[in-house]
């Protein structure tokens, strides 16, 4: 069989689905929490190969010279947003688009749009109207327990740091440990969801 005929007989990949997008979220989180990702993967009924293929296709979509803008890409993959919320940031009138994420029922995937339609932020947030976690001490900062905004509010003032990748965020904050002693730490997030807490200065 010639290469051309083999190519012609190869099935074309199906559309990129909301399930595929959840695998993209998980793929980045596997660097810090492989056990949680493994559990989630089994819950979704997919293989490691499925997760890798979804991530490969997503990277190809985002890096293609013909790539759509972020908002259009998310609409094509996730469908119309379940909720559109006006958001004022300083003097700017912005818009937040939110989609459900079945793997995390109390979270939504949010794309924050600037007035010109450009995507400023793309991350997981708590569903509007849903109570967030009780965050009082370092013991409460467990993987996948909270979002960037929730940690920043609970342990204000928190200082944002540059993330180690486009989908990662870091906050420097001070929180009491189990004995009530304040400790300075760095909370690391992927796609807006807490992954781990580190103590770079040995505090």
How would you describe each model-predicted region?
Residues 2-12:
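N-terminal secretory targeting and juxtamembrane "stalk" segments of secreted and cell-surface proteins
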Residues 10-53, 82-134, 167-203:
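Amphipathic N-proximal alpha-helical interface segments
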Residues 135-140:
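Short, recurring structural edge motifs at helix starts
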Residues 60-61:
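Phosphate/adenylate-binding glycine loop and adjacent helical scaffold
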Residues 68-83, 142-161:
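Amphipathic alpha-helical segments
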């Amino acid at each position: 069989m010639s290469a051309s005929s083999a190519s012609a007989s190869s099935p074309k990949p199906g559309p990129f689905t909301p399930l595929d997008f959840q695998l993209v979220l998980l793929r980045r989180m596997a660097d810090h929490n492989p056990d949680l990702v493994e559990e989630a993967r089994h819950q979704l009924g997919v293989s490691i190969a499925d997760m890798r293929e979804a991530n490969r296709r997503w990277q190809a979509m985002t890096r293609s010279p013909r790539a759509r803008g972020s908002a259009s890409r998310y609409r094509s993959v996730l469908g119309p947003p379940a909720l559109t919320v006006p958001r004022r940031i300083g003097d700017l009138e912005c818009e937040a688009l939110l989609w459900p994420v079945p793997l995390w029922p109390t979270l939504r995937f949010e794309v924050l749009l600037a007035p010109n339609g450009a995507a400023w932020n793309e991350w997981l947030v708590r569903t509007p109207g849903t109570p967030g976690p009780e965050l009082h001490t370092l013991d409460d900062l467990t993987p996948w327990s909270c979002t960037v905004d929730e940690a920043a509010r609970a342990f204000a003032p928190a200082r944002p740091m540059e993330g180690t990748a486009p989908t990662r965020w870091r906050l420097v904050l001070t929180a009491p440990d189990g004995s009530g002693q304040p400790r300075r730490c760095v909370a690391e997030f992927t796609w807006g969801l807490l992954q781990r807490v580190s103590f770079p200065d040995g505090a």
